[in-house]
Amino acid sequence: LRMCDGLPTMQEVGAVAALAQCLVHSLDTQLDRGYTLPRPTPWLLRENKWRAARHGLDAELIIDDAGAVRPVREAIAELVEDLAPVARRLGCTTELDDVRTLAAGPGPAGRQRAAVAAAGGDIGAAVDLLVAEFAAGHPLPPGSGVADAVHAGAAAG
């Protein structure tokens, strides 16, 4: 599984872990029932990997060989809905539901980029934000008191 990285809060870690757990369980069940997984062409995989790396949650992924695209956020919402019964069986409904929250916002990478931009390009602001969010236990978007202090401290430092 290729998953996102830089998850600073346990809520976000739990959400991504639940998504991975539910996906693996669902696909394993389907394979046990004789379902074969589609094999996307190599060019499609390379292009979607690039799009995801470049645009993150704002990416539009190619969904077929004809080049039709779908926004990542829309695909995630549908995937979470499809995996809801699996999450109920596995006891991770709350964590899987948190994927919706994570996908609706800028995500950790977006928050880190915003912190760096607010600090005039100082990459240390991203580290400071990660530390502050880990300590707080939840995301701290720009505009919140602690995040503003982190951004201001990075700009002053």
Map each language-model feature to its residues:
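C-terminal accessory/tail domains of diverse enzymes
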Residues: 2-157
